[in-house]
Amino acid sequence: MAASGGEGSRDVRAPGPPPQQPGARPAVRFRDEAFLNFTSMHGVQPIIARIRELSQQQLDVTQVPRLQWFRDVAALEVPTGLPLREFPFAAYLITGNAGSGKSTCVQTLNEVLDCVVTGATRIAAQNMYVKLSGAFLSRPINTIFHEFGFRGNHVQAQLGQHPYTLASSPASLEDLQRRDLTYYWEVILDITKRALAAHGGEDARNEFHALTALEQTLGLGQGALTRLASVTHGALPAFTRSNIIVIDEAGLLGRHLLTTVVYCWWMINALYHTPQYAGRLRPVLVCVGSPTQTASLESTFEHQKLRCSVRQSENVLTYLICNRTLREYTRLSHSWAIFINNKRCVEHEFGNLMKVLEYGLPITEEHMQFVDRFVVPESYITNPANLPGWTRLFSSHKEVSAYMAKLHAYLKVTREGEFVVFTLPVLTFVSVKEFDEYRRLTQQPTLTMEKWITANASRITNYSQSQDQDAGHVRCEVHSKQQLVVARNDITYVLNSQVAVTARLRKMVFGFDGTFRTFEAVLRDDSFVKTQGETSVEFAYRFLSRLMFGGLIHFYNFLQRPGLDATQRTLAYGRLGELTAELLSLRRDAAGASATRAADTSDRSPGERAFNFKHLGPRDGGPDDFPDDDLDVIFAGLDEQQLDVFYCHYALEEPETTAAVHAQFGLLKRAFLGRYLILRELFGEVFESAPFSTYVDNVIFRGCELLTGSPRGGLMSVALQTDNYTLMGYTYTRVFAFAEELRRRHATAGVAEFLEESPLPYIVLRDQHGFMSVVNTNISEFVESIDSTELAMAINADYGISSKLAMTITRSQGLSLDKVAICFTPGNLRLNSAYVAMSRTTSSEFLHMNLNPLRERHERDDVISEHILSALRDPNVVIVY
């Protein structure tokens, strides 16, 4: 890997191939800023070249949608008046089997091209963020819904209320787009009205006009300032920045969202009159995913029956591949790349099986026999005593919840020391006024609050995994003062179990719990500073300085362990003392001690103030043999070598300047790494694997509860769904920043007042690196839509976590799991679901399932498979191995 500078960089030429011969084919070259995985560069080059070509093609003036057309749309009440109108776009597909490198390819696209990277879901977006920020700092990655203007009140919108019939077969592009806009009309109309209302009725917003005028005034080249518009105007929509939109896991989106993204891109760019709009450029949608793995699901809630029905719909990838009109319009064979080979599990036989399922190839007896080796009785998988540490995958939330209840009952009986079962309360605040209005609109005057809450439990929370939890019975309390009904439920959790957060939650990182080796690794590669210190590196350095200062004593604590070699221990004490004296420039000669101490006091920075023990005189009236001071009691049992004099000569204070922050961090880092090297050399693996924990304040674990004075001094960050967490317990310690956010967001609803009087605990999580965090309460608002009326029905307060011990197959999409046990439902078996479940594993050695899906009666989407096989034979389609 190498990167060369821009035009002003020094011309340093590396030895290369001989000069090109006349008539030879010119070599394909990349710009200097490209960072590529050279093992797949040959396949990635044509992908980037084609996407760049599509993004630079100019439209005819008559093809560009005008701003007035969107104003006309906002004036409509029903979509029957929508005229036929083409919204030009281009598309590029990146598909392939599970773990083949599709998402990794996006990292190259992001570095080489200026594009807007998004995900179909929050998990997909955050997974992409992890990949992009792994090598470079990356701006946060949002969902495609966030980028085109989707809001919380759109979640419950009733789709497909206005029937639409295509005018011809095959339908024209304009007809297909009008059908999609009609289907999504409630959301489209609201987004359009909001955008134009914020616009204020002007011909165009002036952000880009002002920058263009400034370019002309200063004599700068075209685009010199307008390309920096997202920096000078931070609130600009992302669609104004680029016409290349990358959507990861696009197979999870319904087909109508293809037109929605194109429509919103044109509306936003017409509204701001961006340079790309003035240049007549069209949006290019780069759709990443696997059409045979994923499916688009849509849910409809029937209010009279209080029942949620879920149906499968055509997804974006299948829509582009199978629809003749779109296939020809996008020239799909010239805009399609297929990634082959599973890089998640590299076993040859297993990889062949994945290709058979991905591409719809014939299933032979050999394939069935290969899968037979993974089959075990279902009772073996569902018995919590078996397969400890394995992740169970089920077809439905109901099965997951049943297994979790069985697991918790098993742990309560066995009382295994590490895994302790405990419960935490979850609260739902229902507005009495809105509930009465709901009963009136749905003509259900006898509907009870308990029945409504039970029926809507999966809709009230902001994540579907809430249905997987082992919950108790709902208890309702009426609070007349706030006009609220508070529904309380108890959720069971397992201490020290693996969990995932289900939303972007704020967290306060307050300590570290791991080993000496893991903390040293954090300091060595600056991984913590890189991921947590994006807004201000100084905050991350201050936090790590506090942890290192509190953790230095653990090197001396390690030397107190029984069983260590006495000679090595004595040598360690001596070398640690020498290191401290060298770092703090201590003078050991008694003759010059006074002069040196005076000089040190004047020259030393405020953070290195020495403590003078000489002023401690004897107490009046005390016996001669009694210690004169509390410090004497502490130090009486220690000889001079066992005393960590670092704490006697260095006081941790708040640095006031950036230079002081870096100086403090550098000193403490040298002290920590120096001590680490000394003890590693003397004690090796015994020392490196020894437990190491340090916190910003004193911490006590009492069972599942964490007690601490205050997490003040911790570091504010965000808990991501892509991180791996261990549940370490809970705490009632208040975090000021969390309480302030609660008051700011939910003061009017009375929820903040109630939670301040009867606060919920915060959960304590440890991430995969060992950092301990207090995580904010997950609060979600539920807005019900009935016809054209929106009712702010409820606010839910819980912890926003789901267990990794068991999950649905759908939830596992995109994850890599070490050990997997799958329970399929025989009656309704889809082969693409079996493919998703089996492809999660990183090794077939750790894969079990209750039946062989290849031998059972199953559904298989052969239509999409035929198109994929045809594409594999098409010379215009790019194949990446």
UniProtKB/Swiss-Prot annotation:
Residues noted as binding ATP in the record, renumbered to the chain: G96, N97, A98, G99, S100, G101, K102, S103
Renumbered residue ranges of the record's region Disordered: 1-26
Phosphoprotein among keywords: no
InterPro entries: DNA_helicase_dom, HSV_HELI, P-loop_NTPase
Subcellular location: Host nucleus
Pfam families given in the database record: Herpes_Helicase
EC number(s) recorded for this UniProt protein: 3.6.4.-
Superkingdom classification of source: Viruses
GO CC terms: host cell nucleus
Keyword Transmembrane helix: no
Sorted UniProt keywords: ATP-binding, DNA replication, Helicase, Host nucleus, Hydrolase, Nucleotide-binding
GO function term, MF aspect, one: ATP binding
GO annotation terms (biological process): DNA replication
Purpose of the protein: Component of the helicase/primase complex. Unwinds the DNA at the replication forks and generates single-stranded DNA for both leading and lagging strand synthesis. The primase synthesizes short RNA primers on the lagging strand that the polymerase elongates using dNTPs. Possesses helicase-like motifs and therefore may act as the helicase subunit of the complex.
Subunit (UniProt): Associates with the primase and the primase-associated factor to form the helicase-primase complex.
Family: Belongs to the herpesviridae helicase family.
Name of the protein described by the UniProt record: DNA replication helicase
Species of provenance: Human herpesvirus 2 (strain HG52)
Classification of source organism: Viruses, Duplodnaviria, Heunggongvirae, Peploviricota, Herviviricetes
Gene responsible for this protein: HELI
